[in-house]
C-alpha cells in the first residue's frame, strides 16, 4: 500500500505487477537498512508473493443500473431481478449478438416478466455495454421502435370481445387499395379468403387491414392507449390503417407488459404495469382492459404460430405450449418476438439502435429463435385453464366460420363468447336450382321443362374466389346458367384493380415518358371472354387471364368490362 499512491493508475495489482514487486522489495530493503524491521522479518516479507489480481466488479444488468442511476437520484434501490435468470439471459444475449454481428446486426434487448408476481426477473437493455459505438449504450427496452405486426393480437382480441368477429370467420385476402394505401402480405401472395385465427397465426397483412377498417382506427387507437402503449400518442388520423402494420412506435417495455396483462387476465390477477423495485409499489386502482374469454381465444390462435425449429413441435408432448407473436418493421429495421406462458412473458427485440435496416432482420428468423432459447432456460409450466362460465355453444358454418345460416349444410358446435352471437350469419351459402347432373343452374321459369335438384352451394365473391380456388382445389365455383333460361342477375365479374374511385399516379418510364396502368378483374367462369372499354372506347379482349395495360391521360376515367354473356361491370378512377 505504501508504494501504490505514487502511480496508482500505472502500477497496481492488475497492471505492472513486476514493477510493483520491485518497488515493494526496495521499500522493504530501506526499512531493513534503517532497522525499522529486523532481518528475519525482512526475509519473511520479501518471500511473500503479491496478492492475486482482484476479480472484476460484477457487471450484472448494467442497463438497469444505469436506468436507476438516472431515475432514482441516488435513492437506495432493491430490484426484482432474479440474478440467476439475469446472468443466463445476458450470456444467451451475448452469444446471439455474436451470431447476429456477422450480418451487421448489432443490438438486442430482452425483457422477462414473472406473470404471477408481476415482477421483472430479467432486464437486458442491450448488449456490449462497454462499447461506446454502434448504439450499444442505448437501453432499447425503453426506446420507441416501429411495431411491425406485434399489435395484431390486440386487434383480434378487441374484435372478439366486441362481438364483431368469430375465431374462424373468413376474411378477405385479395389485392386492396384503400385511398392509395395498398398493403401486401410478406409472401407477396393472395389466398382469397383465410380464417381469422389462421390469418393471425400467419401474420397476414391484408386480413389485418380489413379487420382494422371494419373495427375502426380511432377505437383501436384508444384501446392501445388503454393497455399502456404510451408512445402511440399522436391522433388516430396520423396513423390511419398503417397502425396495424407498424405505422406506430412502441417500447419493448410497454408491449411485453401488455402481453403479460393478457396472461394475468387468465390467472384472474389484477392487470397493472409490472414492477422493477422491491417492495412492490403501492397498489393503485385500475380497470382491467383484458377479459379472459377473448384472451383465451386469442392465445388459442397464437399457440399455432409456426416455431423456428424445423422439427414438428406439435407432435412432441414435452414441448411447452407458448402463445407467441413476431413482428418485422418496414425496411427490416426492427425484429420483435413476444411470448406468454402462465409463468412468464418474454419480449425480444433485435436490430440496430441507429435505425439501420438489414435484409435478414425478420422477427421469425432472429427474435423468434432468441425467444425460444430463453423459454428453454426458464422453468416450464402447464397451459392456462380455460375460463369457466364465460363461453356459450353456437352452431358455426364449417366452411365460412360464421354463425350457421339458413343453407349451411356442414356445421360444428363451438364455444364462443356471448357477444359472438351477434355476428352475421353465413352469407356464402346459397340455395341454387341445378340440372340433374349439376352442370348448369336452372331458373324457376325453366324448372318444369327438365329434372332439377336444389342444393346448398358455398360461393365466394368473384375476386375472393379467383385466388381462393388456386389454394383450395376442393372449391367448386357455381356452374353457369342454362342458356335461354332468363336473365342472370348474378354478377360473375369483379374488378381486382382499380377499385372504385381510386386515385392513381402513373409511374414514369426510364426515358421519362408516361408509364402504364395495369387493370385486372376476376371472372367466375374460367372460359369466359371479356371485352374491355375505357371511356366507352374499345381497348382489348382477354381470355383465361383478364389483365390489360392502359395509358390513360390525367383526369377522371370510366372502365367497363363486358363478357360474352352480356354481363357488364364498371368502375371509375382518377389519374393524377
Q: Which stretches of residues belong to each language-model region?
A:
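A short, well-structured edge-of-sheet supersecondary motif
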Residues: 65, 80, 103-133, 222-227
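Conserved catalytic neighborhood of penicillin-recognizing serine enzymes
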Residues: 54-69, 165-220, 264, 279-304
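Active-site SXXK
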Residues: 31, 89, 118, 137-171, ...
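Substrate-binding clefts and substrate-entry loops adjacent to catalytic sites
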Residues: 4-14, 69-76, 180, 198, ...
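A penicillin-recognizing enzyme superfamily signal
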Residues: 79-100, 112-114, 123, 131-140, ...
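Soluble, non-transmembrane domains of envelope/secretory-pathway proteins that act on or interact
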Residues: 179, 322-576
Amino acid at each position: 500500500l505504501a508504494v501504490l499512491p505514487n502511480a496508482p493508475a500505472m502500477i497496481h495489482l492488475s497492471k505492472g505487477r513486476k514493477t510493483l514487486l520491485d518497488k515493494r522489495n526496495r521499500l522493504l530493503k530501506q526499512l531493513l537498512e534503517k532497522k525499522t524491521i529486523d532481518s528475519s522479518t525482512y526475509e519473511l516479507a520479501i518471500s511473500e508473493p503479491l496478492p492475486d489480481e482482484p476479480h472484476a466488479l460484477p457487471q450484472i444488468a448494467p442497463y438497469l443500473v444505469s436506468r436507476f442511476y438516472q431515475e432514482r437520484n441516488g435513492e437506495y434501490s432493491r430490484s426484482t431481478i432474479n440474478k440467476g435468470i439475469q446472468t443466463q439471459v445476458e450470456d444467451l444475449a451475448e452469444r446471439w449478438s455474436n451470431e447476429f454481428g456477422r450480418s451487421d446486426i448489432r443490438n438486442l434487448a430482452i425483457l422477462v416478466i414473472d406473470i404471477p408476481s408481476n415482477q421483472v426477473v430479467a432486464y437486458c437493455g442491450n448488449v456490449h455495454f462497454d462499447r461506446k459505438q454502434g448504439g450499444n449504450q442505448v437501453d432499447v427496452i425503453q426506446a420507441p421502435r416501429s411495431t411491425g405486426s406485434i399489435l395484431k393480437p390486440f386487434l383480434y382480441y378487441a374484435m372478439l370481445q366486441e362481438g364483431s368477429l368469430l375465431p374462424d370467420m373468413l376474411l378477405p385476402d385479395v389485392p386492396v387499395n384503400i385511398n392509395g394505401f395498398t398493403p401486401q402480405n410478406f409472401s407477396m401472395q393472395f389466398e382469397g379468403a383465410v380464417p381469422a385465427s389462421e390469418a393471425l397465426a400467419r401474420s397476414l397483412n391484408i386480413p389485418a387491414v380489413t379487420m382494422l377498417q371494419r373495427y375502426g382506427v380511432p377505437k383501436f387507437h384508444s384501446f392501445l392507449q388503454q393497455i399502456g402503449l404510451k408512445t402511440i400518442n399522436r391522433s388516430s388520423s396520423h396513423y390511419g390503417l398503417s397502425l396495424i402494420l407498424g405505422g406506430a412506435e412502441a417500447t419493448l417495455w410497454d408491449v411485453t407488459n401488455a402481453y403479460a396483462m393478457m396472461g394475468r387476465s387468465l390467472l384472474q390477477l389484477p392487470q397493472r404495469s409490472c414492477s422493477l423495485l422491491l417492495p412492490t409499489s403501492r397498489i393503485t386502482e385500475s380497470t382491467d382492459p383484458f377479459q379472459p374469454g377473448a384472451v383465451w381465444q386469442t392465445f388459442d390462435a397464437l399457440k399455432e404460430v409456426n416455431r423456428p425449429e424445423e422439427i414438428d413441435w406439435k407432435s412432441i408432448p414435452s414441448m411447452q405450449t407458448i402463445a407467441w407473436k413476431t413482428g418485422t418493421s418496414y425496411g427490416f429495421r426492427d425484429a420483435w418476438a413476444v411470448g406468454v406462458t402462465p409463468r412468464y412473458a418474454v419480449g425480444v427485440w433485435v436490430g440496430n439502435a441507429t435505425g439501420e435496416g438489414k435484409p435478414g432482420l425478420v422477427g421469425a428468423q432472429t427474435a423468434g429463435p432468441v425467444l425460444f432459447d430463453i423459454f428453454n432456460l426458464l422453468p416450464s409450466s402447464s397451459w392456462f385453464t380455460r375460463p369457466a362460465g364465460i363461453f356459450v355453444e353456437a352452431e358455426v358454418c364449417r366452411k365460412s366460420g360464421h354463425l350457421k345460416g339458413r343453407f349451411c349444410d356442414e356445421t360444428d358446435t363451438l364455444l364462443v363468447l356471448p357477444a359472438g352471437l351477434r355476428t352475421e350469419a353465413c352469407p356464402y351459402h346459397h340455395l341454387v336450382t341445378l340440372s340433374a347432373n349439376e352442370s348448369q343452374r336452372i331458373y324457376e321459369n325453366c324448372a318444369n321443362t327438365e329434372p332439377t335438384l336444389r342444393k346448398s352451394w358455398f360461393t365466394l365473391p368473384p375476386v375472393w374466389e379467383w385466388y381462393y380456388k388456386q389454394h383450395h382445389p376442393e372449391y367448386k365455383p357455381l356452374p353457369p346458367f342454362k342458356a335461354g333460361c332468363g336473365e342472370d342477375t348474378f354478377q360473375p365479374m369483379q374488378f381486382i384493380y382499380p377499385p372504385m374511385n381510386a386515385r392513381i399516379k402513373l409511374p414514369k418510364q426510364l426515358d421519362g415518358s408516361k408509364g402504364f396502368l395495369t387493370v385486372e378483374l376476376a371472372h367466375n367462369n374460367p372460359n369466359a371472354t371479356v371485352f374491355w372499354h375505357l371511356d366507352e372506347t374499345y381497348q382489348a379482349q382477354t381470355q383465361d387471364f383478364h389483365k390489360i395495360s392502359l395509358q390513360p391521360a390525367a383526369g377522371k376515367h370510366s372502365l367497363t368490362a363486358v363478357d360474352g354473356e352480356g354481363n357488364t361491370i364498371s368502375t371509375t378512377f382518377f389519374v393524377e
